[in-house]
């Protein structure tokens, strides 16, 4: 194969050899450009567009965040720490229609027992205690037992509120 190619190369004139060499070089350069360089350049341009888009999104989010903070007027979440822990637990449980079976104060903590309660209502009540009154759940033991779906029994709930 190589002998045939060399024989053909010797059989053509010097002018044709230059023409074939220049044409082959152009084809090689074009091949490198379209197969290697062009895809890389396209990917780089696409990444630059993505970065620009993400920077614009970040700037927009920062602007909107500042607007939200300005609308809040610098007011943070207010935690009501008035009243005793027992009073807060009784009042909020009554408001959430949760029937407490027993309360037992233990120093700075409070033990609570609830016979049956909707699990979702229990979570909402505990979240409101934490968010609005700063009450923390130290220990919770919940059992489903033989209750209807969605109902649970709180065997032990230990609550505290930092002073």
UniProtKB/Swiss-Prot annotation:
Membrane-side (Cytoplasmic) residue stretches: 1-19
InterPro entries assigned to the protein according to its UniProt record, in alphabetical order: T2SS_GspM, T2SS_M_periplasmic_sf
Gene Ontology BP terms: protein secretion by the type II secretion system
Main localization category: membrane
Highest taxon listed in the record's lineage: Bacteria
Annotated localization: Cell inner membrane
Transmembrane segment boundaries: 20-40
Membrane topology term: Single-pass membrane protein
GO CC list: plasma membrane; type II protein secretion system complex
UniProt keyword list: Cell inner membrane, Cell membrane, Membrane, Protein transport, Transmembrane, Transmembrane helix, Transport
Topological domain ranges for the Periplasmic compartment: 41-163
UniProt family annotation: Belongs to the GSP M family.
Subunit: Type II secretion system is composed of four main components: the outer membrane complex, the inner membrane complex, the cytoplasmic secretion ATPase and the periplasm-spanning pseudopilus. Forms homodimers. Interacts with ExeL/GspL. Interacts with ExeE/GspE and ExeF/GspF.
Function per UniProt: Inner membrane component of the type II secretion system required for the energy-dependent secretion of extracellular factors such as proteases and toxins from the periplasm. Plays a role in the complex assembly and recruits ExeL resulting in a stable complex in the inner membrane. Provides thus a link between the energy-providing ExeE protein in the cytoplasm and the rest of the T2SS machinery.
Protein name listed in UniProt: Type II secretion system protein M
Species the sequence originates in: Aeromonas hydrophila
């Amino acid at each position: 194969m190589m002998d045939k190619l060399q024989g053909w190369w010797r059989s053509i004139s010097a002018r044709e050899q230059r023409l074939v060499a220049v044409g082959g070089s152009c084809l090689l350069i074009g091949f490198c450009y379209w197969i290697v360089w062009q895809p890389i350049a396209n990917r780089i341009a696409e990444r630059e567009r993505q970065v620009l888009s993400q920077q614009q999104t970040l700037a927009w989010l920062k602007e909107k965040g500042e607007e939200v903070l300005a609308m809040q007027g610098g007011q943070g979440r207010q935690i009501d720490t008035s009243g005793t822990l027992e009073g807060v637990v009784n009042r909020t449980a009554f408001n959430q229609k949760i029937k407490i079976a027993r309360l037992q104060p233990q120093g700075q903590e409070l033990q609570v027992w609830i016979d049956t309660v909707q699990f979702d209502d229990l979570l909402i009540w505990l979240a409101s205690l934490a968010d609005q009154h700063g009450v923390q759940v130290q220990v919770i033991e919940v059992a489903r037992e033989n209750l209807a779906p969605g109902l649970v029994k709180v065997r032990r709930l230990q609550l505290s509120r930092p002073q």
